[in-house]
């Protein structure tokens, strides 16, 4: 989110060169730069001991492609805690180990998605109401089920080679 007005005093922001950061919104009254804001979220490639990945169907996200577990961080929650919570909520699975993979800017939704690989034991899913379906997919079969170039596709490609 780019500030149009100062959140402290309400004055209209002006564009000003701020050091090496470039031209950004600035409040001349409060004398503060108004840094752009974005939502921090996670996306997780959930894998098991059989070289399979959990892919979800969430019709509110896409009616044509599978997706990965994803969610927004809550205040006071670390990225790792968010991954564990989201996997538990969406799939009913317990995470054994986590590895940070990469961050993915998602400008369309003003988000920064932190990508992780989460290792779990293979078991049946207990789906939340926001997940329409989920399945275990062999690594080599996963990419064609995702929208090519999407953040989920990029993460799965990084994790599965």
For each feature predicted by the language model, list its residue ranges.
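N-terminal leader/linker segments that precede catalytic domains of diphosphate-processing enzymes
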Residues: 1-61, 72-124, 161
């Amino acid at each position: 989110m780019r500030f149009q007005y100062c959140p402290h005093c309400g004055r209209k922001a002006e564009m000003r060169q701020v050091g090496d950061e470039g031209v950004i919104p600035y409040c001349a009254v409060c004398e503060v730069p108004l840094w752009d804001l974005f939502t921090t979220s996670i996306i997780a490639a959930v894998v098991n001991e059989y070289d399979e990945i959990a892919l979800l169907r969430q019709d509110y996200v896409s009616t044509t492609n599978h997706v990965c577990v994803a969610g927004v961080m809550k205040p006071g929650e670390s990225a790792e805690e968010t991954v564990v919570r989201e996997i538990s909520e969406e799939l009913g699975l317990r995470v054994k180990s986590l590895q940070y993979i990469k961050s993915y800017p998602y400008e369309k939704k003003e988000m920064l998605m932190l990508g992780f690989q989460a290792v779990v034991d293979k078991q049946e899913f207990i789906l939340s109401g926001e997940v329409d379906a989920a399945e275990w997919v062999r690594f080599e079969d996963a990419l064609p089920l995702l929208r090519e170039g999407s953040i989920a596709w990029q993460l799965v490609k990084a994790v599965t080679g």
